[in-house]
Every structure is written in structure tokens, then in C-alpha cells.
A protein has these predicted regions:
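A short, polar beta-strand/turn micro-motif
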Residues: 1-28, 43-122
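Hydrophobic beta-strand positions in blades of beta-propellers and related beta-sheet-rich domains
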Residues: 30-39, 123, 131
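Long, internal scaffold/assembly segments composed of regular secondary structure
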Residues: 90-177
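Charged, amphipathic alpha-helical scaffolding segments
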Residues: 33-71, 149-177
Length: 177
């Protein structure tokens, strides 16, 4: 859980860069974190260039709109999934990545062989939500881990071996235009 001191009703958006060469300046109303498997959530400050395919979380006061300009990515991307023996957050092996292509990634195209070593062969497709939603404050309304869960703050777990039997509802989507 990402607990930063921001209001616990703040809605977090999990996202990735919509391409390459995307710059962003973190202002005084924004909390921005990047996921690192070894360090967990790492706070981002100042002006930065988003790493394509890296996972980020953002929340802010109010509802500002951000415009991000990016160069499209047309090449294949290899993402190295890691499992550190121990880390400070106790969440070793949790890899979070985002789709930086301008088209969805169909989870049916992955096979168990795409997951190396003892990594869990499961996709977790998250729906953005608040800290309170993630910690069960709205538990009666949720279908935590259920197939097709669209409740904010919840996810859908898809075993890689089962992905070929699912419909396109379970694509890893791109950022909407």
C-alpha cells in the first residue's frame, strides 16, 4: 500500500509514460512515486523524464489536467522482472510495469515461458482508487480479486496459463488519448 501522508481519501492513479521522452514537473499539490522492486515506492521530485514501461502512482489536490507529449515507441521492449532476496518493504518480487505503447497489450500473447525463475506467473490488472478503498473501507462493495472487478482500488488476477481463454476485456490498456 502506498501511504504517503496524503489524504487517505485521495484517489491514486497508476500509470506509465505514453511513449518516450516525456517530461514532467512535480509541483506542490502533487505526490508522484515510481515503483522499484528492490526499494518499493520511490518519491519523485522536481522535473523528471518518465521511464517508458515503468510503473508510477500519482495523486494531487483538486483535479488538475496534465498534458503529456511523447514520442511513440515502435520497437519491441524487453522488461526484466526481478526478485530481490530481501528489501526494505518486504515486497520482494513485486514488479510493476505499465504499457507505454499506443495500443493495448493482449495478455493472451504471454506464455509461462515469458516468466523466468520462480516469478509468479500471474497478471494483476489494477483499478485506481484511494488508500481507504485499497484497505477495505469499501469492502462490501468490492469484488477483491474477482474476475472483471471494476471497483476502484481493486484488481483482477489472471494466471498466465488461463489468459488464452479470456476475452479482450483483460488487455493491458494504454493511456487514453
Amino acid at each position: 500500500t502506498l501511504d504517503t501522508g496524503a489524504n487517505r481519501d485521495a484517489t491514486w492513479q497508476y500509470f506509465g509514460a505514453p511513449g518516450k521522452n516525456v517530461s514532467f514537473t512535480v509541483d506542490y499539490i502533487t505526490w508522484l512515486y515510481q515503483w522499484h522492486e528492490k526499494q518499493n515506492w520511490v518519491k519523485q521530485n522536481g522535473t523528471l523524464t518518465f521511464e517508458p514501461f515503468a510503473g508510477y502512482a500519482i495523486t494531487q489536490y483538486g483535479q488538475p489536467t496534465y498534458s503529456l507529449m511523447a514520442d511513440p515507441i515502435y520497437t519491441d521492449q524487453t522488461i526484466i522482472l526481478t526478485k530481490t532476496p530481501e528489501n526494505q518493504g518486504g515486497m520482494n518480487g513485486d514488479n510493476l510495469f505499465a504499457n507505454s505503447y499506443m495500443a493495448p497489450i493482449d495478455v493472451k500473447n504471454f506464455t509461462p515461458e515469458d516468466f523466468t525463475g520462480d516469478l509468479e506467473k500471474t497478471f494483476y490488472i489494477f483499478n485506481s482508487g484511494s488508500w481507504n478503498q485499497w484497505n477495505g473501507q469499501n469492502e462490501k462493495d468490492s469484488t477483491l480479486g474477482g474476475n472483471g472487478s471494476t471497483t476502484p482500488g481493486q484488481y483482477c488476477a489472471i494466471p498466465a496459463l488461463s489468459a488464452q481463454y479470456l476475452d479482450s476485456e483483460y488487455d493491458i490498456t494504454t493511456i487514453p488519448p
